[in-house]
């Protein structure tokens, strides 16, 4: 609560002036007992008061939550996750938004493209030797994303200042996450 106006005031922490601070904060939690996820869902919007609607939090099912927690790192007592965890989350959000759009729901195409672009950028941070095991369903979601990425001829890594082709990025992600795909080991 703002001490002068008496109104609630919320802040998004993005693009800090001091480079020692993270670029963005996301909150992750697993579903509490009182919230029932729709069958087959793993990302679920939570109805909130309009005052906090601009804040970012992601409710995860147990499988995704365990995946995040298994890769959690810590710096100065603050837990965080890196590209190895964010890539499957962004890919899953992309799959979810595309599915919802295909069903006729109003989905902003910019959000779909943002998740794809985020995965492309984050994939550049994966060290060549890194291998990240995935639960079967998370692997299936990531494979669906990679299929969609391959099929989308409008995706241009060069517009993101990346020197790889879509095919190279798909191969690198599949290799890192040990996914079974045509043309990979």
Residue ranges and their predicted role:
Residues 1-185:
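Compositionally biased terminal segments of proteins
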């Amino acid at each position: 609560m703002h001490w002068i106006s008496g109104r609630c005031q919320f802040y998004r922490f993005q693009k800090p002036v001091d480079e020692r601070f993270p670029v963005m904060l996301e909150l992750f939690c697993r579903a509490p007992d009182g919230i029932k996820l729709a069958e087959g869902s793993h990302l679920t919007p939570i109805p909130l008061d309009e005052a906090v609607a601009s804040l970012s939090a992601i409710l995860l099912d147990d499988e995704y939550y365990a995946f995040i927690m298994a890769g959690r790192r810590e710096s100065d007592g603050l837990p965080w996750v890196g590209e190895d965890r964010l890539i499957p989350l962004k890919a899953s959000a992309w799959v979810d938004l595309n599915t919802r759009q295909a069903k006729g729901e109003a989905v902003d195409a910019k959000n779909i493209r943002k998740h794809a672009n985020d995965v492309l950028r984050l994939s550049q941070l994966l060290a060549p030797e890194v291998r990240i095991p995935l639960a079967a369903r998370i692997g299936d979601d990531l494979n669906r994303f990679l299929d969609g990425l391959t099929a989308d001829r409008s995706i241009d890594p060069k517009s993101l200042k990346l020197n790889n082709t879509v095919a190279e990025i798909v191969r690198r992600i599949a290799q890192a996450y040990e996914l079974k795909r045509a043309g990979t080991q």
